[in-house]
A protein has these predicted regions:
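Membrane-interfacial alpha-helical segments at the cytosolic side of multi-pass membrane proteins
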Residues: 97-114, 151-157, 172-186
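Internal alpha-helical transmembrane segments of multi-pass membrane proteins
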Residues: 112-135
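Primarily interfacial, aromatic-capped hydrophobic alpha-helices that serve as membrane anchors
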Residues: 166-204
């Protein structure tokens, strides 16, 4: 895993994914100075999370997609777009929750907490069920975090029953789609197997 994280990018796609990570690091300073420490912390958490696709050896296209989605999600929060454009929250939850659930699934498989779906009789169904469950769990944790933030950190954070249900439904749908596409997300030499020092770069 560490070798996969530290190796030089191979090709334009991997370089693009690394450029997005560098952009996230710059965003920590920009958000912290321009919108306050909480915004800077949010960007720092996102920047850390953006290392996961590289660490897991996922294909660069997935790495890029994850980076773009989480950066859009966090900057939408920093800029207050969720408050001015209420519907924007739903597609962002769909994409973000789906990709995060898929990454969590891959991590749990790599650490042998979960069985690799390819070893089971119905791999697509198994991956879809588990990833959807993980996505719903992540959605609940996010709603708890929003409630905590609204109650103790910033009352401008929007919370509400309809908002929470909508977020959970759309996030669960995104996780279901990610689970159904798990074979694409993990179609690389290092995604679900333990990375090796001489592993080839992940395909596009």
């Amino acid at each position: 895993m560490i070798h996969t994280l530290l190796r030089r990018p191979s090709g334009l796609a991997e370089a693009t994914a690394d450029a997005l990570r560098a952009l996230a690091l710059v965003g920590i300073v920009v958000a912290g100075v321009g919108w306050g420490p909480l915004s800077g912390i949010s960007l720092a958490l996102v920047a850390g999370g953006m290392l996961l696709p590289r660490l897991l050896g996922l294909r660069p296209s997935v790495d890029i997609a994850f980076g773009v989605v989480v950066l859009v999600a966090v900057w939408s929060s920093v800029l207050g777009i969720y408050l001015t454009t209420r519907w924007w929250d739903l597609p962002v939850h769909f994409l973000t929750n789906g990709l995060c659930a898929a990454l969590l699934y891959i991590v749990l498989v790599q650490f042998r907490v979960l069985a690799d779906a390819d070893t089971l009789p119905r791999p697509m169904l198994s991956a879809a069920v588990v990833t959807t469950t993980l996505g719903l769990a992540l959605g609940v944790l996010w709603e708890v975090f929003e409630w905590f933030g609204h109650t103790y950190l910033d009352p401008e954070i929007f919370v509400g029953y309809n908002d929470s249900i909508g977020d959970l439904v759309w996030g669960g749908a995104g996780a279901l789609l990610a689970g159904c596409g798990m074979s694409y997300l993990t179609d690389s030499p290092t995604s679900l197997a333990e990375p090796t020092a001489d592993a080839d770069p992940a395909p596009l």
